[in-house]
Amino acid sequence: MMKKFGRKALALSLTAVLGASMVLTGCGEDKKGEDTTAKIGLTTGLASDTTADISIMTWSGDSKYYEDIGSMDLSTDKLTSQNVAQVYSVAKQFKKLYPNIKINLWAKTGDPDQPGTPKWEQEMTSFKAKYGKYPDIWASTSVTNDIKKGLAADLSVFKDDETYKAYNKNLMSNLNYYGFQGGLPSFSIPWGIWVNKALAESKNINVPDPDWTIDEYTRFFTKSDNTSFWGDKSTPVNIINMGTTTINKQIKEKGTVDLDNDEVKSLLSYIPKWAASTIDVAEGAGTLSKDIKIESKTYSWYYFCNNRCLTNITDPWYLTAGADESAKESESYIDSKDWDIYPFPSTDYCGNTIKVVMDPICIHNYAADDGNKEWSDDEKAKLKATYTFATYWTASTEAKQAIFDQKWTDNGAEKSAAGDSFPVVTGDTYNKQMDIWNNLPAHKTYKDKEGWKEILKLWENNESWDYIDKCWTSKITEKGETTDVLYEWNNMWKEEVAGAWMTDKDWGDKVKARLSDWNTTINKRIETATKQLQDKLVENYNFDKSKFTSDNK
């Protein structure tokens, strides 16, 4: 059920962190008084002679520091990190538009919280100690925590900017807190369910259509022989999270959950059926062969790639690697002649839908630098320059094309720096950027996949009610202890939490008996976390308390 953050980091794109002290000249027009934005495809009116020094910090990199990377001439063999290659390509293009703006880059190797290295929060602090200030834009692992620290600027001041208005509203809403826009969407992809159609057909298992129901999904899932292949690596509880109106949907819309209701109780009966057809249960029972474990290194995605699972619900970030025919020897390549990605199945309560993966970026709250919460003209100018780069980077077609055209070296193979990430904008700009996405060789296989076509429809119509854990108060810290807000629900597979194992006959009854208490405990945590965020919005930003009643997020 739980995803591996490390595997996700390997597929990250557009998740850099900008940090710098800036010296700015100009605030909307060039020296001749002519607005140059129409010429360069930007909409903020930032003068072309603006001077700034911007440092980028990102994870999943190479732990090298690149000063003024946009002025460098790096050969493909020197670019061994996809994220570094992406930032390099965008900085080069931005340099043509703003020759006096320097972009520097430090890219941490591995994950933000890579084992054996400082946590991402500590890296942020170290950045400040080394460079004299916090990053200006960073890939955030918790936007609400960054707001509580007073680090993130409110970007709603740009709400009239045309680029701001072009962002996908569903993505932007996850970063909006009572009107406070805490960041911008960066790496974003739809999250569906991988389906190994060829494996199913080889076992004489009928493959449902992409508009499948939860019962069709269950019949398909449980046709596994549980010896050589299974339904999935782990129990797909996310089917219930997305198949009710009172869990993920209610978190997104109201910021609360309701676990103790008929919707949830009726769907709990599916869990023991699913669990019995998972690799996790086979491993726990000692029936999973050693050879199969070694073959896939016990990793959920590799089990799917090696035809050991009919489905995979936990690893959405292999859109490129899974389909890259130029890297068939890669462990991440799907070794199946026919596969697809389906939406989540419908239930009696919700239609087919998708989850969403989004990595947000935040922009530094310059007003806090001098201890005065009010914005000076100089601080506003810094914010405008940083926001201009951030929007060019994440939203412009020019940046997407530059990334597509840029090459990097992946284990000796030369590849495009483009990857999984979807456009984070809408309208004609979205269509143009999806054309670029579709032109990547590894992505061309998707055009003929029926499930994928449904995924695209749901994405484009914003038919997802998923919340983003990096944007919501998914964890709470009290007295130095950090707890998962949804701890009991997310750990109901543990005997010590539920009172039984998922495959036990009485598991469902024991969980149902606990739902009321879990509901109370979880919502108390949510209430506390929400109050902490509200208090810090007022303390750090002089935020208007009256706005707390107009939005339940």
Per-range role (PLM):
Residues 156-167, 210, 247-269, 273-274, ...:
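Short, solvent-exposed loop/beta-turn-alpha elements that line the ligand-binding surface or hinge
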